[in-house]
Swiss-Prot record:
Record PTM text: Both N- and O-glycosylated.
Assembly mode: Monomer.
InterPro entries (alphabetical): Beta_cellobiohydrolase, Beta_cellobiohydrolase_sf, CBD_sf, Cellulose-bd_dom_fun, Glyco_hydro_6_CS
Glycosylation sites noted in the Swiss-Prot or TrEMBL record: 175
Cited SMART domains: fCBD
Any single GO BP term: cellulose catabolic process
CBM1 domain mapped to chain residues: 26-62
Region (Disordered): 68-98
EC number(s) per entry: 3.2.1.91
Main location: secreted
Summary of the function given for this chain in its UniProt record: Exoglucanase that plays an important function in biomass degradation by catalyzing the hydrolysis of the non-reducing end beta-1,4-glucosidic linkages in cellulose and cellotetraose to release cellobiose. Hydrolyzes crystalline and amorphous cellulose but is inactive on hydroxyethyl cellulose, mannan, galactomannan, xyloglucan, arabinoxylan, arabinan, xylan, and pectin.
Protein name: 1,4-beta-D-glucan cellobiohydrolase CEL6A
Amino acid sequence: MAKRLLLTAALAATTLAAPVIEERQNCGSVWSQCGGQGWTGATCCASGSTCVAQNQWYSQCLPGSQVTTTAQAPSSTRTTTSSSSRPTSSSISTSAVNVPTTTTSAGASVTVPPGGGASSTASYSGNPFLGVQQWANSYYSSEVHTLAIPSLTGPMATKAAAVAKVPSFQWMDRNVTVDTLFSGTLADIRAANRAGANPPYAGIFVVYDLPDRDCAAAASNGEWAIADGGAAKYKAYIDRIRHHLVQYSDIRTILVIEPDSLANMVTNMNVPKCQGAANTYKELTVYALKQLNLPNVAMYLDAGHAGWLGWPANIGPAAELFAGIYKDAGRPTSLRGLATNVANYNGWSLSSAPSYTTPNPNFDEKRFVQAFSPLLTAAGFPAHFITDTGRSGKQPTGQLEWGHWCNAIGTGFGPRPTTDTGLDIEDAFVWIKPGGECDGTSDTTAARYDHHCGFADALKPAPEAGQWFQAYFEQLLTNANPPF
């Protein structure tokens, strides 16, 4: 299952004078690693690119500068209570970051909603994707325009520009994103809606910051540990999200809750980290569902995918687990159902089973949700579904095994977001994983290396999870179905 570190505050890196010619010959090429904790290779970039610190583990040569540069520590453009794991080049900008703020006594930046706050509540009934437009992720759009397109020409550049316009979910994968990208995006949506957007825009986001996150893998470990007060920190993170949702109650907001977390509770309880995290995961998921149960909010719990929970041995226990969470949270009206195939590659409705899915009878996402739905209903959770089709365009993929989740070869952008799913329990096809952001590094010496990213069916060389992966974006674009 793909692992992710996405959507943190926009940060900038300063540039130093070019080193001598002899050093320049050994500098990294564009997109290569140029620094980070434990890195022993070149710490400068060839002419035409800049070494930008992405997080403490990884710096990357990004296009933009016309001189050779050396890795520099980023400096935040905003006052926050937490440092960002995913700073970006100063060439990446998004209007979502530039929002009016005030400072609390704790020093955290807090958005002041323009125009005096909400004048109404964006309540709804039934399918929350009906009657609204999904908001295109401005951060992802900026990545495509500033990182992808400069390396492309002709039809590929034109197609890439079209990708940037497709709505995709924005990830709150660090505490710092809540009072920056999240609140800023809500401010942008409010401005667009007040300017007459018809139908109005809805915000689409992923809540993804559990302590001891990603308990069964290494590629996208989170910022908090359960042993170091992580539960209290997570509750404060959820409380901040709630604060902004209340401030922007005039905006319908759709949330996917904690990819991978509960699915790991079904299949990976043999992993010590998952055993230790299980009770906390459940407690904090229930807390999030209760706190975010607001009339303008719709929530979908992440439920893995057909190749994870769709197996006959897993699907029954999964239904019991999700129904239990639903009941423990008090059957929140804003919990609409489950999200499937997040950051994965499965097709929706296939005529035949890919070889790597055998012998699972639920070899695509449609079969999975149709098998899952009656079990959930019988357990007391009448769930609806959304499915991530962002990387499902090419079927079969180049995966050698179904569980090979990292930067899989032979994949393409898939069906565009729509409510025309042909299935009453399926609310929408959506793009949850922004295509082109890496699943995990192939560098075996990296602190967050996961062995799945070194398999023969994983595209290499790959940067750290969440960093821009130009070769992967081009693969998705080339194999897009329907094409751009």
